[in-house]
Amino acid sequence: MSENGTVRAMWTDAELDDALSALHKETEPPSADVRATLMLACRETPPKPRRRYTWAAATAAVAALTAGVLTIPGAPSAAAEALDSAAAHVLAEPDPRPGPGQFFYTSTRESAMASSMTSTGKPLSLLEESMTQLWVPAIRAEEWFVRSGQTGARKWLVGNEDLARREGDGGLLDPRVSRERVQRGLCGDFPDQRELGGTPDDGKPCGERYGHWEAPTPRFLADLPRDPDALYERLSKDAKGRGADVLRLASGVLRAAETSADLRAAVYRALVKLPGLDVTDNAANLDGRRGTALGLTEGDLRDEVIVDTASGRYIGRRSVLVKPGTGYWAGLQPGTVVEFTAVTLGVADKAGTPPAN
């Protein structure tokens, strides 16, 4: 789902790319999986500063956004220890499942960077925050409910609002992307999906839909191996061997409310096998919850998943710039967080109302 916009329940990467190319500039920001794909493209060859991407999400309440990332000596063994601890604890926790009339609940709060230039060529970058809340009924064929949109929270990284107003913001402060949107749909068939051309599972009975890593259905989750070696092999194959994509695909399963405890544990243990994975302790996420950040560096960015090893709960993910910023990242210092996502899972009694705890 979008951590900064609406839910995209059953899209393949190719279809998302096609849909994005046809989007009007007033379209709602796409989902987190779409934005993640775009972010990965940026890291290889950073584009010149330009008009904001309409998918850019938001933040203003991130603690220590530009704090440096500390890599701990002996990180591979530290990563294995942290992931094994998370796996053991998640198996010891009850596996929450909604009863009749209840809902799986997922709250995704995201901040991501948008970048542009003033009319005089000065770089501008800011973080904006978006919020998506999703309620999926215990019987998936029934009506789903999603509320999404930007919160209005904003933090400048390069430049400021006065400069943007005085010399032009290049579309960075476009108010049209800030509205909240509420949608309902049987089996997650939301109106925005039809606007973008539908999904590969359109027309199929709800129980026969398959989904993919970043929008998994019960069928997809059931087909994933629980053996860590086999699961890592599947992750690596589908990620085409790229470590950052392994983390992205694994995160799609970890943030899904319907993922069972045994599969979460298997994902943690599969990530132990990811070459180059290391640890940053005491990493704060968007909501201020603290956990262990496990990640790796490719190109200009360090990608991390953040886990509460004491409970096994997946907290979120973040991307950190590791080199002095150029191009799209112009003016940013190493250690700047350019994307940050926090996920909260639970069981709700009523669509539109978050769980009490």
Task: Locate predicted features.
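Intrinsically disordered, low-complexity prosegments and terminal tails associated
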Residues: 2, 63-357
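N-terminal export/targeting signals for secretion/compartment entry
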Residues: 1-88
